[in-house]
């Protein structure tokens, strides 16, 4: 197997899924979605959507041969807000931006020194930016703290995105104030119909790209597990749940990944994946934080 952190790093500029390596297999580049769901990528690859609008199965490689596995599309890093609104400045003090030269994923501050994000957002070097609203402007409220430890869930699966959760230990504690503070972990699982708040600096378009400078918010309900599984047959595990609208139009998107889904003041979800952004019958899929509360607490205790 060869993936973004293995023997072909030049092919993978950002977080991605593992691929089987074969002669002539090249990394796909983002292209336009064509009729029938196919997409044309780099090196002559014909691509078909698999998960998240980020990962595609290659039908043939650069030499015209059958590709051996899945190709992770470099998506400039990760997931999205479509159909939302600009958040009130510093109204979500738990929201963080993960930066590696530029913003690439979101996260949530759960204690003075720990952040929850998505495992597929993993990079070896991450700067956590707290107190942000406009990520292109220094507004005077920010705290930039490097990651001291980056810990993916031990059972994270890059192919299925199961257990898509990661902890980041800050090199020094955040200074808690009105603009930087923590969000509580869940005490009960997310109930269908509950209104939640999703936030991030991700793409605001279902087709094309428009990345905002200011933090975007989206109010959306938790869907039933039956609705979630019907939207993605065979792909929803017990660690995943769906939030959004089956009619489409509102969703998280690229570069929102790792960010928070907050319901009744508790961190219930982590932005994980979806098929496209804000497509009909393709709601966003989120990591169910409730399932990982014990792992989070045990990991923090073991790395304090």
Curated annotation (Swiss-Prot):
The cofactors it requires, by name, are:
Ca(2+)
Tissue specificity here reads: Detected in pancreas and pancreatic fluid (at protein level). Expressed in pancreas and brain. Detected in ileum.
Entry's cofactor comment = Binds 1 Ca(2+) ion per subunit.
What are the TM regions of this chain, as residue ranges?
none
The Peptidase S1 domain sits at 81-301
User: Which SMART domains does the record associate with it?
Assistant: Tryp_SPc (SM00020)
Which pairs are disulfide-linked?
A: 87-217, 105-121, 196-263, 228-242, 253-277
Which positions carry Sulfotyrosine?
Answer: 211
Q: Name one GO biological process term.
A: antimicrobial humoral response
Which terms are listed as keywords in the entry?
Answer: Calcium, Digestion, Disulfide bond, Hydrolase, Metal-binding, Protease, Secreted, Serine protease, Signal, Sulfation, Zymogen
Q: Which GO terms describe its cellular component?
A: extracellular region; extracellular space; tertiary granule lumen
Q: Does the keyword Calcium apply?
A: yes
User: Is Secreted among this UniProt entry's keywords?
Assistant: yes
Top enzyme category: hydrolase
Instruction: Write down the position(s) of the site called Required for specificity.
Output: 251
The positions annotated for binding Ca(2+) are 132, 134, 137, 139, 142
A Pfam family of this chain: Trypsin
Describe the pH profile of activity: Optimum pH is 8.5.
The UniProt note on how this protein's activity is regulated states: Not inhibited by Kunitz-type trypsin inhibitors.
E.C. number(s) listed in UniProt: 3.4.21.4
- Supply one GO molecular-function term: calcium ion binding
Q: What does this protein do?
A: Digestive protease that cleaves proteins preferentially after an Arg residue and has proteolytic activity toward Kunitz-type trypsin inhibitors.
Family, as annotated = Belongs to the peptidase S1 family.
Q: What is this protein called?
A: Trypsin-3
Q: Which gene encodes it?
A: PRSS3
């Amino acid at each position: 197997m060869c993936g973004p952190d293995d023997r072909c790093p030049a092919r993978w500029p950002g977080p991605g899924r593992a691929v089987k390596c074969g002669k002539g297999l090249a990394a796909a580049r983002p292209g336009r979605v064509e009729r029938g769901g196919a997409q044309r990528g780099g090196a002559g690859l014909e691509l078909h959507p698999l998960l998240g609008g980020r990962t595609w199965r290659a039908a043939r490689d650069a030499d015209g041969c059958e590709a051996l596995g899945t190709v992770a599309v470099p998506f400039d890093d990760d997931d999205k807000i479509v159909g939302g609104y600009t958040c009130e400045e510093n109204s979500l003090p738990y929201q963080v931006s993960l930066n590696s030269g530029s913003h690439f994923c979101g996260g949530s501050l759960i204690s003075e020194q720990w952040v929850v994000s998505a495992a597929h957002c993993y990079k070896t070097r991450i700067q956590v930016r707290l107190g942000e609203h406009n990520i292109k402007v220094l507004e005077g409220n920010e705290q930039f703290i490097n990651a001291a430890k980056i810990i993916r869930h031990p059972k994270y699966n890059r192919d299925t995105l199961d257990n898509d959760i990661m902890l980041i230990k800050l090199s020094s504690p955040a200074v808690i104030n009105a603009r930087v503070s923590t969000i509580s972990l869940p005490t009960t699982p997310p109930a269908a119909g509950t209104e939640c708040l999703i936030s991030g600096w991700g793409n605001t378009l279902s087709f094309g790209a428009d990345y905002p400078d200011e933090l975007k918010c989206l109010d959306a309900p938790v869907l039933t597990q039956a609705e979630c599984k019907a939207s993605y047959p065979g792909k929803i595990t017990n660690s995943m749940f769906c939030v959004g609208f089956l009619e489409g139009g509102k969703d998280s998107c690229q570069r929102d990944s790792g960010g928070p889904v907050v319901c009744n003041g508790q961190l219930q979800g982590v932005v994980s994946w979806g098929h496209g952004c804000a497509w009909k019958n393709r709601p966003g899929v989120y990591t169910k934080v409730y399932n990982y509360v014990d792992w989070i607490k045990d990991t923090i205790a073991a790395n304090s």
